Amino acid sequence: MTQNPKKIKVTLVKSLIGTKQAHRATARGLGLRHVNSSVEVEDTPAVRGMINNIYYLVKSEV
């Protein structure tokens, strides 16, 4: 039987204007476009690394 993977809710709380191009690309990779947009993503090491990369722009909840 497979278990449901854990999800993390990620919300973009600061604007991407003036940030590094790589950080903008990371936010887009997570599916975040506008301020206050939220997505639920699977809890994987890759996703956690992306969140850590842009920690100052997002808020995350388990």
UniProtKB/Swiss-Prot annotation:
InterPro entries: Ribo_uL30_ferredoxin-like_sf, Ribosomal_uL30_bac-type, Ribosomal_uL30_ferredoxin-like
Keyword entries, A-Z: Ribonucleoprotein, Ribosomal protein
GO BP terms, alphabetized: translation
GO terms for MF: structural constituent of ribosome
Family: Belongs to the universal ribosomal protein uL30 family.
Complex formation: Part of the 50S ribosomal subunit.
Protein's UniProt name: Large ribosomal subunit protein uL30
